[in-house]
Amino acid sequence: MTITQLRQRYEKHPNIEALNRILDDTTLKHFYCGGLSASSSSLLASVLISKEKHPFVFILGNLEEAGYFYHDLVQLLGEEKVLFFPSSFRRAIKYGQKDAANEILRTEVLSRLQKQEKGLCIVTYPDALAEKVVSQQELQEKTLKLFQGDRVDMQFVVDVLREFNFEFVDYVYEPGQYAVRGSIIDVFSFSSEYPYRIDFFGDEIESLRTFEVQSQLSKEKRNDVVIVPDLSRGLSKQGGNLISFLDFLSADTILA
């Protein structure tokens, strides 16, 4: 039996319709769903998520459990709508070793949530939730959005990157860096898996692309890009608007 056939069987189960009615009832704040084991919980979740009525946040017991659950959902739904929200630390928080890749994943989740995309599903675990995040307002102030065809001064973009504490380098190879070569700005946002290449023609953005770090070759054309700095940098010292991740979520989010 294929994954598609399994999902179709779950979709036709009478309890799915009952669950959807419960999720749509705003007067109900808590309910219990039991009797699931192994990957059956992922299958059930994938059917509910596919309705795209609410954002979902699944809180697993630890990193390993969250990783397995995330992998199952990606196999069922694809990568576009399923996001992973890890701890920003490589090991336990007490060791203080930040992981740039994890920080990218965390920032991407916040950026996607702020856009209020329908059908988002986020998988996380307690260690990740223990770390506070910036507020919606703080994130908005620390976000630069650029679109192909925008009329914007190249120096303005450079000034914003400096203000965001991006590091000027010859070649971009890790998040938080930018480089300038002629009419091109390369920048590695903390909200993207790949760095961006912004090509100007005078005061107009002629093209936006992602590129590979190792080869420095262009990868994919984009209509728009979102540039976000390291949101944790300096906030603890400045007393920035740090809040719980759960407070960042919209009121219609389903926690499971």
Regions found by a protein language model. Name each.
Residues M1-A256:
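ASCE RecA-like P-loop NTPase motor cores
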